[in-house]
Design a protein with these regions (language model features):
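Extracytoplasmic
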Residues: 11-43, 67
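Residue-level signature of mid-helix packing/kink "hotspots" within the transmembrane helices
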Residues: 28, 57-65, 149-150
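Cytoplasmic helix-loop-helix junction between adjacent transmembrane helices
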Residues: 106-145
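Helix-breaking motifs and short loop linkers at transmembrane-helix boundaries and internal kinks
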Residues: 43, 75, 96-102, 113, ...
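Helix-loop-helix hairpin linking two adjacent transmembrane segments in secondary transporters
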Residues: 102, 131, 136-192
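Conserved MFS/SLC helix-loop-helix module at the cytosolic interface between two early adjacent transmembrane helices
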Residues: 62-101
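Extracellular/periplasmic helix-loop-helix junction of adjacent transmembrane segments
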Residues: 33-62
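Juxtamembrane intracellular "pre-TM" segments in multi-pass secondary transporters
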Residues: 2-5, 191-216
């Protein structure tokens, strides 16, 4: 499907870049804080601290199975905003986590929410463009995705110096909130959803994705 884009192309490009940045930013900003966070949560083994990263990757991996079919059924913007809401709630939960288990749960949920902008950004681009222009937009999006980790750790260190490790989660929550407001007010709905039109294809894909998760 190729829909008309009703926003300036440079703004659309910037918005897609920010959507792609959410997952990479929230993953790499935490790296400088693993030591102090582990100490406060009573985790002395450096290998155990790495589970904070693993939990996030697990959440984002599972989330990517679901947001594509769900956005086909219920619309791109709705699922994007739901995913960002989950991400923000999980980020705030992480700021008050008083046990390592709670932190792992919050990070997994944060990853699940971060999967929404990652998946839906690509779907929106496919809705709006075809051919060479789609390839150029996706190339820019992937460039942002690759470039963000280069400075995310340094940004995490700056936030850590200005505050404590929960401030990193507050930063990512604020970043996602800005994205949610920007998307909610400016991003046009590029695919309204098939749930009310008897289209069972996305539903079958969702069931298939659920089966993969359950089997693994």
């Amino acid at each position: 499907m190729n829909v008309q884009l009703r926003m300036p192309f440079p703004e659309f490009l910037a918005l897609i870049g920010v959507m792609m940045a959410v997952g990479a930013l929230s993953l790499d900003m935490m790296l400088p804080a693993l030591g102090v966070m582990g100490d406060e949560l009573g985790i002395t083994d450096p290998n155990d601290r790495q589970q904070v990263i693993t939990a996030f990757l697990l959440g984002i991996g599972i989330g990517q199975l679901f947001y594509g079919p769900l956005s086909d059924l219920y619309g791109r913007k709705r699922m994007l905003l739901i995913g960002l809401g989950i991400f923000i709630a999980a980020s705030l939960w992480a700021t008050v986590a008083h046990s390592f288990e709670a932190m792992l749960a919050a990070r997994a949920l944060q990853g699940f929410g971060a999967a929404a902008p990652r998946v839906i950004s690509a779907a929106v681009v496919r809705d709006c463009f075809v051919g060479d222009r789609m390839a150029r937009v996706m190339s820019f999006a992937m460039l942002v995705f690759i470039a963000v980790p280069i400075f995310a750790s340094a940004l995490g260190m700056l936030v850590l110096l200005a505050g404590d490790w929960p401030a990193i989660f507050l930063f990512t929550a604020a970043f996602a909130l800005v994205l949610a407001l920007w998307s909610g007010f400016r991003l046009p709905e590029t695919h309204a959803g098939d749930a009310g039109h008897g289209n069972r294809g996305p539903f079958r894909r969702l069931l298939h994705a659920s089966g993969i998760v359950l089997r693994t």
